[in-house]
Amino acid sequence: LGDGVAGSGIIDYNLNISPGPNQVGFDFSHIMADTQDRVPTVYIENGKVVNLDPNDPIEVNFFHQNKHDDYGLPTGLKNPEMTTMKWHHGHNGSIINGVPRIGYMKGGKNALWSDIDMADHFLDKSIEYIKANKSRPFFLFYSLQQPHVPRTPHPRFEGQSGMGPRGDAIIEADWSIGELYKTLQSEDLLDNTFI
């Protein structure tokens, strides 16, 4: 969805978010609001933030002027001891799940994703979609968040590549594609599917 109109950051994540995939022909969408390294760290399904509590609205700001003051959540710049990885290249905003992000965020606590569970989450959603739609032709756009920064593979993949977090995230991505392939096989869809 980007950073808002002309980079203004003006998207109200507490309302129906549009335009999005549903406005360009997708019957169903389950996406990230932006890249994994930016706020807000929430999933959006059919234009609505998943698990958003209306009593804890989301506020996003990419233009917080005082970089040394926290904006809602602690920041990587001011609170490096709270991070699980060193920040770099502007990734020093709000800390969520130990990861310093680009941008600043307040609210939306119940809607926050778990970085280490993202591959499983998107895989499960995709498998669910395949099984629910297997009796008719469908188009599934399965876009992997790995190996984009912050590269947070699930612990079961940590150290598997011998090449650090990026290599481990690639191993996780490869596993995810394999699981999707197995689903197409088990649902007897593989012979009638373009991958």
Predicted regions and their residues:
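Active-site His/acidic residue clusters
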Residues: 40, 45-48, 126-168
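Loop/turn elements at helix/coil->beta-strand transitions in domains of secreted/extracellular proteins
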Residues: 24-27, 133-140, 188-195
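Non-transmembrane alpha-helical segments in soluble domains
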Residues: 27-30, 41, 127-131, 181, ...
